[in-house]
């Protein structure tokens, strides 16, 4: 009687252990996806501020249409890329979003460089309020990125640890990329000052 009990117990135990590992990987993957969605929420907030910023600047920057158009085009591209990444936050989609964010950062940097040469615009109350909102949103985005990177590190560490690595490969759990894994050349910091 004991001869059949040990193999059955071993099979049940190993099956149970694999279920626990699989569920842990699913939970960590979902936490990573949730952390990305927090970035997405803050980026959406940022993208929603930009048209107001451009409209406020438009009254003062009549001869800077190219600058304003580049900001709006970069914003629209980043928003479309964000929506695609929301559907499926794959490493490729996140890489495209990071690239779109770098382009938008460069366009915003150009806008704020132009704003510096217009004292009336710098003194505008609406522009000041939008500037404060943008700075606050940038801080929220930075915090969300940090939380995302933390979730990615936990997920990747677990995914690459034995015995989880065996089930991760069979279960299709792909390595996640950190938000900051873009080249130094693509990074453009948005400097806003009034």
Task: List the model feature ranges, each with a label.
Residues 1-194:
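A helix-centric hydrophobic-segment signal that preferentially recognizes long
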């Amino acid at each position: 009687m004991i001869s059949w009990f040990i193999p059955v117990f071993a099979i049940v135990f190993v099956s149970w252990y694999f279920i626990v590992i699989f569920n842990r990987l699913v939970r960590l993957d979902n936490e990573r996806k949730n952390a990305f969605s927090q970035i997405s929420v803050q980026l959406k907030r940022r993208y929603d501020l930009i048209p107001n910023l451009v409209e406020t600047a438009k009254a003062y920057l009549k001869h800077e249409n190219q600058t304003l158009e580049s900001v709006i085009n970069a914003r629209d591209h980043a928003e479309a890329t964000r929506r695609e990444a929301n559907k499926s936050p794959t490493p490729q989609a996140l890489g495209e979003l990071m690239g779109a964010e770098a382009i938008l950062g460069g366009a915003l940097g150009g806008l704020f460089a132009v704003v510096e040469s217009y004292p009336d615009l710098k003194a505008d109350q609406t522009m000041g309020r939008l500037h404060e909102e943008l700075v606050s949103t940038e801080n929220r985005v930075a915090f969300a990125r940090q939380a995302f990177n933390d979730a990615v590190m936990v997920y990747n560490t677990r995914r690459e640890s034995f015995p989880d690595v065996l089930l991760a490969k069979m279960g299709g759990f792909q390595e996640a990329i950190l938000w900051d894994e873009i080249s130094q050349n693509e990074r453009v910091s948005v400097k806003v000052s009034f």
